[in-house]
Swiss-Prot record:
Name of this protein: Energy-coupling factor transporter transmembrane protein EcfT
Pfam entry (one): CbiQ
Primary role: Transmembrane (T) component of an energy-coupling factor (ECF) ABC-transporter complex. Unlike classic ABC transporters this ECF transporter provides the energy necessary to transport a number of different substrates.
Keyword Cell membrane attributed: yes
Sequence intervals crossing the membrane: 26-46, 47-67, 72-92, 107-127, 152-172, 243-263
Similarity-based family: Belongs to the energy-coupling factor EcfT family.
GO cellular component: plasma membrane
Length: 265
């Protein structure tokens, strides 16, 4: 299941979303995340879902490809849904059997919060799938440039965030390899009680940490060999270009925001 993790991966395709400036995509996603947290009824969530499908169509990515990326975090979504179903009270009583008491408000809140998670994950995943890691680093650095006046290491922060994001699928792949190696030696991580499964995961941690530190060391050596010395005197082979279609795409947030605020009230 871990090998299906797609967050942090880049899929080079020819599409409108791929051509957009990464700074525009980051600002768009940030504002959309704020709007998603403002959603409070089915109409506003419907707007968010329709928007996701439009963006998917414009990025030439299939819905099933994106949906498969949810499987590694499916447990978190189910856990969130169940927590609200059993703990949130209000509305009509749907089930009342012994200690189990499920009310309509809990079901509604559970579905809405789960939808909120899914929309945010879809948006951020589409951004990483359609943005080159180097361009993503440059975009973060460009957006954080005003903080240079506060003597903050903007370039280093941007590089750190980009590397961390890029290492997510790498570490997931490494975890998958270690799990298969352990299972080939007779270890069964899918059977037994919850306590036994947790114990079975512990042998994964040591080789995974060793591999992560080894990859980090190799990356540091490779950067040093290529003469990387931070932002000082660094030039860029490719520069970010803001086009008219980036401005127009960003302006679509105005009617989207107004519509969500109208439906919210």
């Amino acid at each position: 299941m871990l090998d299906k993790m797609i967050l942090g991966r880049f899929v080079p395709l020819q599409s409108f979303v791929h051509r957009l400036d990464p700074r525009m995509k980051m600002v768009f996603v940030f504002i959309m995340m704020i709007l998603i947290f403002l959603m409070n009824n089915w109409q506003t969530y419907a707007v968010g879902i329709i928007l996701i499908f439009i963006i998917l169509k414009a990025s030439n990515l299939s819905f099933m490809f994106l949906f498969n990326g949810l499987k590694p975090i499916l447990f978190l979504l189910i856990f969130t849904l169940l927590m609200h179903i059993f703990l949130t009270k209000g509305g009509a009583t749907l089930v009342d059997y012994g200690i189990i008491n499920i009310q309509s408000q809990g079901v509604i809140m559970g579905i809405m919060i789960s939808l909120r998670f899914i929309l945010i994950i879809f948006l951020t995943t589409i951004m990483t799938l359609t943005t080159n890691p180097i361009e993503l680093t440059d975009a973060i650095e460009s957006l954080l440039k005003p903080f240079k006046k506060l003597k903050l290491p903007v370039h280093e922060l941007a590089l750190m965030m980009s590397i961390a994001l890029r290492f997510i699928p790498t570490l997931m792949d490494e975890t998958q390899k270690v799990m298969k190696a352990q299972m080939s030696r007779g270890s069964d991580m899918t059977a037994g009680t919850l306590k036994e499964r947790i114990k079975a995961v512990i042998p994964l941690l040591v080789p995974l940490f060793v591999s992560a530190f080894k990859r980090a060391e190799d990356l540091a050596i490779a950067m040093e060999v290529r003469g990387y010395k931070g932002d000082a005197g660094r030039t860029k082979y490719r520069k970010l270009d803001w086009h008219t279609y980036d401005t127009l795409s960003l302006l679509t947030l105005i009617p989207i925001t107004l519509l969500i605020l109208y439906l919210k009230n």
